[in-house]
């Protein structure tokens, strides 16, 4: 009930509800009511599960007819846009850390790594704001924002992984970097497409007496898509987003029940993820940084 009150309060004052859930997590954390949660690996796992569900649901809501006119600029924003954002932000961090009064002096590659972790738009926040606020955006801006926010995470993820590998291996060649990008994009897109087709086939061919099991079957397919893509060295987030687009743009049995289930589950994991992130933040530790 408290979470519902927080959500209603955010909607009433025009504040994104997810931001309030982040604050609630901070208030319940070790510097607030004393709830201890400091396991970054568990938080990462929760984030992976949540983001997979959020991106799949976002893909289901993305219609080919809406994104077709803005497909090219949307892809450019989610690839080159993220790359340029990481580059310029990294250069700014490197320049700022070199100032005498900062006393940090970060190397350029470390600055680029920090910038890469924040270079993408948070798809959970964008989807939530566009849906809850019911914004009447013109010139196909809404589908472009949804496409960009849903497809830019793989680029930021790959930038981060490549830069970490570069640091750990004391340097990678340009061919290796380009090859890593190509493999993750191609394998992720191909796996998402074919497993999305397989999910459609299973939903339409399987005869299950209990209709409530169809959404559960699709949810298990989301995790299967992410896992198999990751094993093949592809990008799992791109795969689940494309698989969601395939499912959402084709005829499937029990569409209403599936959409209702996925919408509720998406909101649940958005709340869980931001509460978890809030619990990881200790305001007292930020004083020295500030």
Q: What are the language-model segments listed below?
A:
Residues 1-290:
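Transmembrane helical cores of multi-pass secondary ion antiporters/exchangers
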């Amino acid at each position: 009930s408290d979470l519902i009150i927080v959500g209603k309060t955010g909607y009433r004052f025009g504040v994104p509800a997810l931001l309030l859930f982040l604050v609630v997590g901070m208030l319940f954390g070790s510097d607030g009511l004393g709830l201890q949660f400091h396991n970054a690996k568990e938080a990462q796992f929760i984030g992976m599960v949540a983001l997979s569900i959020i991106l799949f649901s976002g893909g289901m809501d993305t219609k080919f007819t809406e994104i077709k006119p803005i497909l090219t600029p949307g892809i450019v924003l989610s690839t080159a846009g993220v790359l340029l954002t990481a580059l310029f932000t990294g250069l700014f961090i490197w320049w700022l850390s070199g100032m005498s009064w900062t006393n940090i002096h970060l190397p350029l590659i470390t600055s680029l790594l920090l910038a890469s972790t924040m270079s993408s738009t948070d798809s959970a926040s964008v989807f939530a704001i566009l849906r809850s606020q019911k914004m009447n955006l013109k010139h196909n801006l809404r589908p472009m924002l949804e496409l960009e926010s849903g497809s830019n995470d793989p680029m930021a993820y790959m930038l981060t992984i490549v830069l970490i590998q570069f640091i750990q291996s004391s340097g990678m060649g340009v061919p290796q970097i380009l090859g890593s990008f190509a493999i993750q994009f191609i394998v992720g897109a191909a796996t998402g497409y074919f497993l999305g087709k397989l999910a459609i086939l299973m939903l339409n061919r399987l005869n299950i007496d209990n209709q409530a099991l169809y959404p559960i079957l699709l949810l298990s397919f989301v995790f299967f898509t992410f896992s198999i893509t990751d094993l093949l060295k592809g990008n799992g987030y791109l795969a689940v987003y494309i698989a969601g687009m395939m499912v959402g743009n084709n005829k499937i049995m029990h569409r209403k029940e599936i959409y209702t289930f996925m919408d509720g589950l998406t909101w649940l994991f958005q709340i869980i993820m931001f509460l978890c992130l809030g619990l990881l933040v200790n305001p007292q530790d930020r004083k020295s940084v500030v």
